[in-house]
Amino acid sequence: MVKINQDLLNSIKEFTLMDDPFMTKVFEDDIERTQLILRIILENDTIKVKKASTQKRFKNLQGRDLQLDILAEKADGTKFNVEVQNESSGAIPQRARYHMSLLDAKSLPKGEYFDKIPENYVIFITKEDVLKGLLPIYHIHRTIDENGHSFADGSHIIYVNAKIHNDTPLGMLMHDFCCKNPDDMHYKKLAEKIKYFKEEKEGLDKMGDVMEKLIAKREKEALEKMAKKYEAKAAKAQKEARISLAKEMLANNESIDKIVKYSKLSVKEVRALAAKMSA
């Protein structure tokens, strides 16, 4: 476990619920607080969460696996997947569709009739207004093109715009999701848990595991970035060498086919070089 020194303590104080590692810790196995945010987002105070977990991995034997930020479930099997996204690219419609598909696949036991599949929800809380409608929340449902009627298949995709902070319950929740100081938060239950992880010794000790994973993740990302940088440089150098060879062969009046064969450039690229050299 990483020992919490002053530098790490300062980093922890900068966390908000929009930061995946911190959000994961705050909502880990926390039915009460998961239920709180679902009731606010869905404007339904009757929602009763039976199970809640974070970083739940969904295996897909024939495709890409998913690791869900928050997964909650009601007694009737209804599932809620809440994802926090700081990057707009991580909240594209196709991703929401894929999350829903796996959520549905995990909701119907073998041999059950299709009408037994429960209603399911995929909720993206996004740092930016991804759908660009200047709205605080977007509800997406399938409709019949010809008459505009609801298809009513029980799937619900919701985008919450975390940029809008106002005096509505949702606006205050988004303020709290973006707030660093628990003393400035609206919802006491969230503030208490955040204060625990940011200020109390027991909570800070538990944050050591989070920081260890975060440091490892950042080191991995740095190495991957460095590898991509050198791969790009190598590719550029290789391209330049091929162009140089092609120019030399053109100067020696070699055939286009021969130049393409040895330089690995395309016919179009070789012809463009030839035109440039003869201009």
Predicted segments — roles?
Residues 1-203:
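Conserved single-residue anchors adjacent to enzymatic active/cofactor-binding motifs
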Residues 2-15, 80-85, 171-279:
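Short, charged alpha-helical interaction segments and adjacent helix-coil junctions
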